[in-house]
Amino acid sequence: MLEVTSIHKGIVIDHITSGKGLKIFQKLNLDKISSPVVLLMNVSSKTLGKKDVIKIQDEVDLDLTMLGLIDQNITINLISQGEIAEKRQVKLPVKVKGLFECKNPRCITSVDDYAQSEFTLVPNGKIQYRCHYCEELTEYKL
Amino acid sequence: MSLKGRHLIDPNQLSLAELDNIITLGLEIYRNPNHYREICKGKILGTLFYEPSTRTRLSFESAMLRMGGTVLGFSDANTSSAKKGESIADTIRVLDDYADLLVMRHPREGAPLLASQYATVPIVNGGDGGHQHPTQTLTDLITIHHNKGKIENLKVAFCGDLLFGRTVHSLLKTLSRFPNMEFVFISPSELKIPKHLKDEVIKSNNVEIVETTFLEKHMSEIDILYMTRIQKERFFNEEEYVKLKDSYILDLQKLRNAKEDLLIMHPLPRVNEIHPEVDTDTRAKYFEQAKLGVYVRMALMALQLGVIESC
Ligand SMILES: [Zn+2]
Protein backbone atom coordinates (compact mmCIF):
# COMPACT_ATOMS: atom_id res chain seq x y z
CA MET A 1 0.00 0.00 0.00
CA LEU A 2 1.04 3.54 -0.71
CA GLU A 3 2.50 5.08 2.40
CA VAL A 4 2.57 8.71 3.34
CA THR A 5 4.51 9.58 6.42
CA SER A 6 2.50 10.91 9.33
CA ILE A 7 2.63 14.60 10.01
CA HIS A 8 3.94 16.27 13.13
CA LYS A 9 1.54 19.17 13.16
CA GLY A 10 -1.49 19.89 11.02
CA ILE A 11 -4.90 18.65 9.95
CA VAL A 12 -5.97 15.24 8.68
CA ILE A 13 -9.35 15.06 7.01
CA ASP A 14 -10.17 11.38 7.22
CA HIS A 15 -12.97 9.01 6.18
CA ILE A 16 -13.91 10.98 3.09
CA THR A 17 -16.19 8.92 0.87
CA SER A 18 -14.04 7.65 -1.95
CA GLY A 19 -14.24 10.06 -4.89
CA LYS A 20 -15.14 13.16 -2.90
CA GLY A 21 -11.58 14.03 -1.88
CA LEU A 22 -10.81 16.05 -4.96
CA LYS A 23 -14.00 18.11 -4.59
CA ILE A 24 -13.08 18.94 -1.02
CA PHE A 25 -9.55 19.77 -2.12
CA GLN A 26 -10.99 22.26 -4.60
CA LYS A 27 -13.69 23.67 -2.32
CA LEU A 28 -11.15 24.36 0.42
CA ASN A 29 -8.83 25.98 -2.14
CA LEU A 30 -5.99 23.74 -1.02
CA ASP A 31 -4.17 24.31 -4.30
CA LYS A 32 -3.64 27.90 -3.16
CA ILE A 33 -2.01 27.32 0.20
CA SER A 34 1.72 27.28 0.67
CA SER A 35 1.93 24.42 3.21
CA PRO A 36 2.53 20.84 2.10
CA VAL A 37 -0.72 19.03 1.29
CA VAL A 38 -1.46 15.51 0.14
CA LEU A 39 -4.64 14.09 -1.25
CA LEU A 40 -4.89 10.32 -0.96
CA MET A 41 -7.54 8.64 -3.04
CA ASN A 42 -8.98 5.15 -2.78
CA VAL A 43 -7.05 4.20 0.33
CA SER A 44 -8.34 1.00 1.92
CA SER A 45 -10.49 1.52 4.99
CA LYS A 46 -11.81 -0.91 7.57
CA THR A 47 -15.20 0.76 7.82
CA LEU A 48 -15.69 2.22 4.34
CA GLY A 49 -13.82 -0.28 2.16
CA LYS A 50 -12.24 2.61 0.32
CA LYS A 51 -11.79 6.18 1.37
CA ASP A 52 -10.04 9.43 0.51
CA VAL A 53 -7.82 11.28 2.97
CA ILE A 54 -6.37 14.79 2.94
CA LYS A 55 -3.34 15.66 5.04
CA ILE A 56 -2.30 19.25 5.54
CA GLN A 57 0.95 20.02 7.27
CA ASP A 58 1.33 23.03 9.58
CA GLU A 59 -1.35 25.25 10.99
CA VAL A 60 -3.61 26.48 8.24
CA ASP A 61 -6.67 28.64 8.77
CA LEU A 62 -9.47 26.86 6.95
CA ASP A 63 -13.24 27.14 7.12
CA LEU A 64 -14.17 23.52 7.61
CA THR A 65 -17.92 24.22 8.01
CA MET A 66 -18.66 23.06 4.49
CA LEU A 67 -17.27 19.57 5.06
CA GLY A 68 -20.54 18.66 6.76
CA LEU A 69 -22.39 19.65 3.61
CA ILE A 70 -20.24 17.47 1.42
CA ASP A 71 -19.87 14.31 3.45
CA GLN A 72 -21.07 13.64 6.97
CA ASN A 73 -18.84 10.62 7.46
CA ILE A 74 -15.75 12.78 7.59
CA THR A 75 -13.58 12.98 10.70
CA ILE A 76 -11.21 15.84 11.26
CA ASN A 77 -8.05 15.10 13.23
CA LEU A 78 -6.07 18.01 14.53
CA ILE A 79 -2.47 16.88 14.91
CA SER A 80 -0.06 18.39 17.34
CA GLN A 81 3.38 17.05 18.26
CA GLY A 82 2.82 13.95 16.16
CA GLU A 83 -0.36 12.97 17.97
CA ILE A 84 -4.07 13.46 17.49
CA ALA A 85 -4.80 16.40 19.74
CA GLU A 86 -8.46 16.64 18.80
CA LYS A 87 -10.88 14.47 16.85
CA ARG A 88 -13.92 16.18 15.39
CA GLN A 89 -17.00 14.74 13.72
CA VAL A 90 -18.44 16.98 11.06
CA LYS A 91 -22.06 18.05 11.20
CA LEU A 92 -24.48 19.66 8.81
CA PRO A 93 -23.89 23.34 9.49
CA VAL A 94 -26.93 25.19 10.83
CA LYS A 95 -25.79 28.58 9.53
CA VAL A 96 -23.98 28.89 6.23
CA LYS A 97 -22.49 32.07 4.78
CA GLY A 98 -21.35 32.45 1.21
CA LEU A 99 -20.65 28.79 0.42
CA PHE A 100 -23.37 28.44 -2.18
CA GLU A 101 -25.91 30.59 -3.93
CA CYS A 102 -29.60 31.14 -3.37
CA LYS A 103 -31.55 29.43 -6.13
CA ASN A 104 -34.17 32.19 -6.26
CA PRO A 105 -33.40 34.30 -9.36
CA ARG A 106 -35.34 37.23 -7.85
CA CYS A 107 -33.21 37.27 -4.71
CA ILE A 108 -31.15 40.38 -3.96
CA THR A 109 -28.08 38.17 -3.36
CA SER A 110 -27.97 37.37 -7.07
CA VAL A 111 -27.32 40.98 -8.09
CA ASP A 112 -25.87 42.93 -5.18
CA ASP A 113 -22.29 42.29 -4.09
CA TYR A 114 -23.03 43.56 -0.59
CA ALA A 115 -25.66 40.88 -0.07
CA GLN A 116 -23.60 37.82 0.70
CA SER A 117 -25.76 34.71 0.65
CA GLU A 118 -26.60 33.53 4.13
CA PHE A 119 -28.68 30.50 5.04
CA THR A 120 -30.19 28.60 7.93
CA LEU A 121 -30.74 24.84 7.82
CA VAL A 122 -34.40 23.82 7.71
CA PRO A 123 -34.96 20.78 9.94
CA ASN A 124 -36.97 18.71 7.47
CA GLY A 125 -34.69 15.75 6.80
CA LYS A 126 -33.48 17.11 3.46
CA ILE A 127 -30.41 19.28 3.14
CA GLN A 128 -32.46 22.43 2.62
CA TYR A 129 -31.42 25.92 3.58
CA ARG A 130 -33.62 29.00 3.99
CA CYS A 131 -32.21 32.20 2.52
CA HIS A 132 -31.77 35.00 5.02
CA TYR A 133 -32.85 37.57 2.43
CA CYS A 134 -35.70 36.09 0.40
CA GLU A 135 -36.63 33.07 2.61
CA GLU A 136 -36.69 30.68 -0.37
CA LEU A 137 -35.39 27.18 0.22
CA THR A 138 -32.30 26.00 -1.59
CA GLU A 139 -31.38 22.35 -1.62
CA TYR A 140 -27.66 21.92 -1.26
CA LYS A 141 -26.04 19.81 -3.92
CA LEU A 142 -22.33 19.53 -4.45
CA MET B 1 -41.07 46.84 23.35
CA SER B 2 -41.01 50.25 21.73
CA LEU B 3 -41.14 50.53 17.96
CA LYS B 4 -39.00 53.65 18.02
CA GLY B 5 -36.07 53.38 15.63
CA ARG B 6 -37.03 49.89 14.48
CA HIS B 7 -37.21 48.63 10.91
CA LEU B 8 -40.24 46.84 9.50
CA ILE B 9 -39.19 44.29 6.90
CA ASP B 10 -41.47 41.36 7.70
CA PRO B 11 -44.80 41.53 9.57
CA ASN B 12 -43.66 38.66 11.77
CA GLN B 13 -41.06 40.95 13.32
CA LEU B 14 -43.98 42.43 15.22
CA SER B 15 -45.41 40.70 18.26
CA LEU B 16 -49.18 40.37 18.59
CA ALA B 17 -49.07 43.12 21.22
CA GLU B 18 -47.17 45.41 18.85
CA LEU B 19 -49.59 44.67 16.02
CA ASP B 20 -52.43 45.50 18.36
CA ASN B 21 -50.71 48.73 19.37
CA ILE B 22 -50.29 49.87 15.75
CA ILE B 23 -53.87 48.97 14.84
CA THR B 24 -55.37 50.64 17.91
CA LEU B 25 -53.40 53.81 17.26
CA GLY B 26 -54.32 53.69 13.55
CA LEU B 27 -58.02 53.55 14.44
CA GLU B 28 -57.60 56.34 16.97
CA ILE B 29 -55.99 58.55 14.30
CA TYR B 30 -58.74 57.55 11.83
CA ARG B 31 -61.39 58.77 14.27
CA ASN B 32 -59.59 61.92 15.36
CA PRO B 33 -57.27 62.94 12.52
CA ASN B 34 -57.11 66.57 13.62
CA HIS B 35 -55.29 65.65 16.84
CA TYR B 36 -52.41 64.27 14.83
CA ARG B 37 -52.03 66.92 12.13
CA GLU B 38 -48.74 68.28 13.34
CA ILE B 39 -47.07 65.43 15.18
CA CYS B 40 -44.47 64.88 12.43
CA LYS B 41 -43.67 68.53 11.82
CA GLY B 42 -40.03 68.74 10.76
CA LYS B 43 -39.82 65.03 9.90
CA ILE B 44 -38.94 63.83 6.42
CA LEU B 45 -40.04 60.58 4.81
CA GLY B 46 -37.82 59.27 2.02
CA THR B 47 -39.58 57.11 -0.58
CA LEU B 48 -37.16 54.87 -2.48
CA PHE B 49 -39.27 53.22 -5.16
CA TYR B 50 -37.08 51.11 -7.41
CA GLU B 51 -40.19 50.01 -9.25
CA PRO B 52 -43.36 52.02 -9.66
CA SER B 53 -46.23 51.40 -7.29
CA THR B 54 -48.27 54.53 -7.26
CA ARG B 55 -50.84 53.38 -4.73
CA THR B 56 -48.38 52.28 -2.10
CA ARG B 57 -46.22 55.37 -2.57
CA LEU B 58 -49.16 57.78 -2.41
CA SER B 59 -50.50 56.03 0.66
CA PHE B 60 -47.19 56.56 2.48
CA GLU B 61 -46.88 60.15 1.23
CA SER B 62 -50.42 60.98 2.25
CA ALA B 63 -49.79 59.45 5.67
CA MET B 64 -46.70 61.58 6.27
CA LEU B 65 -48.29 64.76 4.92
CA ARG B 66 -51.35 64.21 7.14
CA MET B 67 -49.04 64.28 10.15
CA GLY B 68 -47.39 67.54 9.09
CA GLY B 69 -44.18 65.98 7.78
CA THR B 70 -42.67 66.26 4.32
CA VAL B 71 -41.61 63.72 1.71
CA LEU B 72 -38.89 63.31 -0.87
CA GLY B 73 -37.78 60.43 -3.01
CA PHE B 74 -37.84 58.76 -6.37
CA SER B 75 -40.28 56.43 -8.04
CA ASP B 76 -38.25 55.07 -10.90
CA ALA B 77 -34.77 53.68 -10.36
CA ASN B 78 -33.72 54.45 -13.95
CA THR B 79 -34.16 58.20 -13.76
CA SER B 80 -32.89 58.59 -10.22
CA SER B 81 -29.52 58.84 -8.58
CA ALA B 82 -29.85 55.19 -7.61
CA LYS B 83 -28.80 54.18 -11.06
CA LYS B 84 -28.32 50.67 -12.21
CA GLY B 85 -25.34 48.92 -10.76
CA GLU B 86 -25.01 50.96 -7.60
CA SER B 87 -25.23 48.80 -4.54
CA ILE B 88 -28.14 49.36 -2.19
CA ALA B 89 -25.59 49.70 0.61
CA ASP B 90 -24.06 52.78 -1.09
CA THR B 91 -27.43 54.34 -1.90
CA ILE B 92 -28.52 53.96 1.69
CA ARG B 93 -25.28 55.32 3.12
CA VAL B 94 -26.00 58.55 1.22
CA LEU B 95 -29.79 58.85 1.48
CA ASP B 96 -29.85 57.83 5.12
CA ASP B 97 -28.92 61.40 6.01
CA TYR B 98 -31.64 62.96 3.88
CA ALA B 99 -34.65 61.58 5.72
CA ASP B 100 -35.82 60.46 9.17
CA LEU B 101 -37.50 57.31 7.87
CA LEU B 102 -37.20 55.47 4.57
CA VAL B 103 -39.72 53.31 2.74
CA MET B 104 -38.28 51.05 0.07
CA ARG B 105 -40.06 49.27 -2.75
CA HIS B 106 -37.79 46.96 -4.73
CA PRO B 107 -38.29 44.20 -7.31
CA ARG B 108 -35.56 42.09 -5.65
CA GLU B 109 -36.54 39.94 -2.70
CA GLY B 110 -34.56 40.78 0.40
CA ALA B 111 -33.51 44.27 -0.82
CA PRO B 112 -35.11 46.15 2.12
CA LEU B 113 -33.45 43.77 4.57
CA LEU B 114 -30.09 44.55 2.96
CA ALA B 115 -30.91 48.28 3.17
CA SER B 116 -31.74 47.95 6.87
CA GLN B 117 -28.24 46.60 7.52
CA TYR B 118 -26.75 49.92 6.38
CA ALA B 119 -29.37 52.39 7.57
CA THR B 120 -29.36 54.37 10.78
CA VAL B 121 -32.96 55.52 10.29
CA PRO B 122 -35.88 53.07 10.25
CA ILE B 123 -36.53 51.27 6.96
CA VAL B 124 -40.02 50.14 6.00
CA ASN B 125 -40.39 47.43 3.39
CA GLY B 126 -42.86 48.78 0.84
CA GLY B 127 -42.90 45.46 -1.03
CA ASP B 128 -39.98 43.32 -2.21
CA GLY B 129 -40.77 41.21 -5.27
CA GLY B 130 -43.09 38.37 -4.40
CA HIS B 131 -41.79 38.21 -0.86
CA GLN B 132 -43.20 40.58 1.74
CA HIS B 133 -45.45 43.60 1.93
CA PRO B 134 -45.89 44.24 5.65
CA THR B 135 -47.84 47.49 5.40
CA GLN B 136 -50.42 45.78 3.17
CA THR B 137 -50.77 43.20 5.94
CA LEU B 138 -51.21 45.98 8.50
CA THR B 139 -53.83 47.52 6.21
CA ASP B 140 -55.67 44.20 6.04
CA LEU B 141 -55.48 43.71 9.80
CA ILE B 142 -56.80 47.18 10.65
CA THR B 143 -59.69 46.61 8.24
CA ILE B 144 -60.55 43.33 9.93
CA HIS B 145 -60.29 44.87 13.39
CA HIS B 146 -62.33 47.93 12.43
CA ASN B 147 -65.15 45.81 11.02
CA LYS B 148 -65.11 42.79 13.32
CA GLY B 149 -63.90 44.44 16.53
CA LYS B 150 -61.35 41.63 16.93
CA ILE B 151 -58.84 39.48 15.09
CA GLU B 152 -59.55 35.98 16.40
CA ASN B 153 -62.15 33.24 16.03
CA LEU B 154 -62.66 34.04 12.37
CA LYS B 155 -63.10 31.91 9.30
CA VAL B 156 -61.21 33.56 6.49
CA ALA B 157 -61.44 32.56 2.82
CA PHE B 158 -58.74 33.54 0.34
CA CYS B 159 -59.77 33.40 -3.31
CA GLY B 160 -57.75 33.72 -6.51
CA ASP B 161 -54.05 33.37 -7.17
CA LEU B 162 -52.86 31.80 -3.94
CA LEU B 163 -49.60 30.55 -5.43
CA PHE B 164 -47.98 33.87 -6.29
CA GLY B 165 -50.15 36.19 -4.23
CA ARG B 166 -47.73 37.97 -1.93
CA THR B 167 -50.45 39.81 -0.02
CA VAL B 168 -52.21 36.51 0.71
CA HIS B 169 -49.03 34.81 1.96
CA SER B 170 -48.13 37.68 4.22
CA LEU B 171 -51.62 38.07 5.68
CA LEU B 172 -52.09 34.34 6.08
CA LYS B 173 -48.84 33.91 8.01
CA THR B 174 -49.77 36.77 10.30
CA LEU B 175 -53.39 35.71 10.82
CA SER B 176 -52.33 32.19 11.71
CA ARG B 177 -50.64 33.63 14.81
CA PHE B 178 -54.00 34.78 16.17
CA PRO B 179 -56.18 32.40 18.22
CA ASN B 180 -58.76 30.05 16.70
CA MET B 181 -58.53 30.97 13.05
CA GLU B 182 -59.88 28.83 10.22
CA PHE B 183 -58.91 29.21 6.59
CA VAL B 184 -60.55 28.32 3.30
CA PHE B 185 -58.33 28.40 0.21
CA ILE B 186 -60.23 28.88 -3.05
CA SER B 187 -58.12 28.64 -6.18
CA PRO B 188 -57.65 26.78 -9.44
CA SER B 189 -55.50 23.70 -8.94
CA GLU B 190 -52.62 25.41 -10.80
CA LEU B 191 -52.61 28.31 -8.35
CA LYS B 192 -52.97 26.50 -5.04
CA ILE B 193 -51.33 27.82 -1.91
CA PRO B 194 -47.69 26.59 -1.75
CA LYS B 195 -47.33 23.42 0.30
CA HIS B 196 -44.55 24.75 2.51
CA LEU B 197 -46.71 27.69 3.49
CA LYS B 198 -49.70 25.46 4.19
CA ASP B 199 -47.58 23.18 6.38
CA GLU B 200 -46.16 26.15 8.22
CA VAL B 201 -49.59 27.61 8.87
CA ILE B 202 -51.06 24.32 10.05
CA LYS B 203 -48.12 23.65 12.34
CA SER B 204 -48.02 27.15 13.78
CA ASN B 205 -51.32 27.03 15.57
CA ASN B 206 -53.06 23.81 14.65
CA VAL B 207 -55.42 25.80 12.49
CA GLU B 208 -58.17 24.25 10.41
CA ILE B 209 -57.85 24.61 6.67
CA VAL B 210 -59.99 23.63 3.69
CA GLU B 211 -59.01 23.74 0.02
CA THR B 212 -61.52 24.00 -2.79
CA THR B 213 -61.85 25.20 -6.37
CA PHE B 214 -65.40 26.52 -5.91
CA LEU B 215 -65.98 30.02 -4.67
CA GLU B 216 -69.50 29.43 -3.38
CA LYS B 217 -68.88 26.16 -1.58
CA HIS B 218 -68.17 27.59 1.89
CA MET B 219 -69.81 30.98 1.36
CA SER B 220 -72.37 30.59 4.13
CA GLU B 221 -69.76 29.82 6.81
CA ILE B 222 -67.07 32.39 6.21
CA ASP B 223 -66.54 35.67 8.07
CA ILE B 224 -64.07 37.22 5.64
CA LEU B 225 -63.67 36.79 1.89
CA TYR B 226 -60.30 38.02 0.66
CA MET B 227 -60.39 38.29 -3.14
CA THR B 228 -57.27 38.60 -5.30
CA ARG B 229 -56.59 38.95 -8.98
CA ILE B 230 -56.07 35.98 -11.25
CA GLN B 231 -53.89 36.79 -14.18
CA LYS B 232 -54.52 35.03 -17.44
CA GLU B 233 -50.80 34.51 -18.04
CA ARG B 234 -50.55 32.35 -14.93
CA PHE B 235 -52.51 29.60 -16.66
CA PHE B 236 -50.97 26.82 -18.66
CA ASN B 237 -53.93 26.47 -20.95
CA GLU B 238 -56.49 28.90 -22.21
CA GLU B 239 -59.37 26.45 -21.81
CA GLU B 240 -58.77 26.10 -18.08
CA TYR B 241 -58.64 29.86 -17.68
CA VAL B 242 -61.90 30.40 -19.54
CA LYS B 243 -63.56 27.70 -17.44
CA LEU B 244 -62.45 29.19 -14.14
CA LYS B 245 -62.35 32.91 -14.70
CA ASP B 246 -66.10 33.33 -14.37
CA SER B 247 -66.40 31.18 -11.27
CA TYR B 248 -64.10 33.59 -9.45
CA ILE B 249 -66.04 36.69 -10.35
CA LEU B 250 -67.83 37.69 -7.21
CA ASP B 251 -71.34 38.99 -7.86
CA LEU B 252 -74.47 39.41 -5.76
CA GLN B 253 -75.82 36.07 -6.92
CA LYS B 254 -72.79 34.29 -5.42
CA LEU B 255 -73.27 36.22 -2.20
CA ARG B 256 -76.86 35.17 -1.62
CA ASN B 257 -75.97 32.59 1.03
CA ALA B 258 -73.26 34.68 2.65
CA LYS B 259 -73.43 35.98 6.21
CA GLU B 260 -74.93 39.42 6.74
CA ASP B 261 -71.73 40.63 8.32
CA LEU B 262 -69.36 39.04 5.82
CA LEU B 263 -66.33 41.24 5.20
CA ILE B 264 -65.32 41.41 1.53
CA MET B 265 -61.74 42.54 1.04
CA HIS B 266 -59.36 43.01 -1.90
CA PRO B 267 -55.86 44.53 -1.91
CA LEU B 268 -56.71 46.43 -5.15
CA PRO B 269 -56.37 47.12 -7.98
CA ARG B 270 -59.16 44.84 -9.06
CA VAL B 271 -59.69 43.89 -12.67
CA ASN B 272 -62.90 41.94 -12.98
CA GLU B 273 -62.91 39.55 -10.03
CA ILE B 274 -65.49 41.62 -8.15
CA HIS B 275 -68.49 42.76 -10.16
CA PRO B 276 -69.20 46.49 -9.71
CA GLU B 277 -72.71 45.62 -8.47
CA VAL B 278 -71.07 44.38 -5.25
CA ASP B 279 -69.52 47.80 -4.55
CA THR B 280 -72.67 49.22 -3.00
CA ASP B 281 -73.28 46.14 -0.84
CA THR B 282 -72.61 47.02 2.79
CA ARG B 283 -70.31 44.01 3.07
CA ALA B 284 -67.88 45.37 0.46
CA LYS B 285 -65.02 47.02 2.31
CA TYR B 286 -62.18 47.18 -0.21
CA PHE B 287 -62.27 50.93 -0.67
CA GLU B 288 -62.42 51.45 3.06
CA GLN B 289 -59.47 49.07 3.25
CA ALA B 290 -57.38 51.35 0.99
CA LYS B 291 -58.41 54.34 3.10
CA LEU B 292 -57.51 52.65 6.39
CA GLY B 293 -54.11 51.84 4.86
CA VAL B 294 -53.18 55.51 5.17
CA TYR B 295 -54.09 55.62 8.88
CA VAL B 296 -52.28 52.44 9.78
CA ARG B 297 -49.18 53.78 8.02
CA MET B 298 -49.53 57.01 10.02
CA ALA B 299 -49.61 54.97 13.22
CA LEU B 300 -46.64 52.85 12.19
CA MET B 301 -44.46 55.81 11.20
CA ALA B 302 -45.41 57.85 14.27
CA LEU B 303 -44.32 54.94 16.48
CA GLN B 304 -41.11 54.30 14.52
CA LEU B 305 -40.20 57.98 14.65
CA GLY B 306 -40.97 58.02 18.35
CA VAL B 307 -43.31 61.03 18.11
CA ILE B 308 -45.84 58.80 19.85
CA GLU B 309 -44.64 56.21 22.35
CA SER B 310 -47.70 53.97 22.33
CA CYS B 311 -51.41 54.45 22.70
ZN1 LIG C 1 -32.43 34.35 -1.47
From Swiss-Prot, chain B:
Give the GO biological process terms. 'de novo' pyrimidine nucleobase biosynthetic process; 'de novo' UMP biosynthetic process; amino acid metabolic process
Its Enzyme Commission number(s) read 2.1.3.2
- Give the enzyme class: transferase
Annotated GO MF terms: amino acid binding; aspartate carbamoyltransferase activity
Pathway where this protein functions: Pyrimidine metabolism; UMP biosynthesis via de novo pathway; (S)-dihydroorotate from bicarbonate: step 2/3
Residue numbers binding L-aspartate: 84, 166, 229
Give yes or no: UniProt keyword Transferase: yes
Q: Which UniProt key words apply to this protein? A: Pyrimidine biosynthesis, Transferase
Q: Which residues cross the membrane?
A: none
PROSITE patterns referenced in this protein's UniProt entry, alphabetically: CARBAMOYLTRANSFERASE (PS00097)
At the top level, the lineage of the source is: Bacteria
Q: Which reaction does it catalyse?
A: carbamoyl phosphate + L-aspartate = N-carbamoyl-L-aspartate + phosphate + H(+)
Claim: Nucleus is one of the keywords in the record: no
Q: Which residues bind carbamoyl phosphate?
A: 55-56, 105, 133, 136, 268-269
Q: According to its UniProt entry, what is the function of this protein? A: Catalyzes the condensation of carbamoyl phosphate and aspartate to form carbamoyl aspartate and inorganic phosphate, the committed step in the de novo pyrimidine nucleotide biosynthesis pathway.
Q: Which NCBIfam families match?
A: asp_carb_tr, PRK00856.1
Q: Which family does it belong to?
A: Belongs to the aspartate/ornithine carbamoyltransferase superfamily. ATCase family.
Q: Which proteins does it associate with, and in what oligomeric form?
A: Heterododecamer (2C3:3R2) of six catalytic PyrB chains organized as two trimers (C3), and six regulatory PyrI chains organized as three dimers (R2).
Please report the name of this protein according to its UniProt entry: Aspartate carbamoyltransferase catalytic subunit
Q: Which organism is it from?
A: Alkaliphilus metalliredigens (strain QYMF)
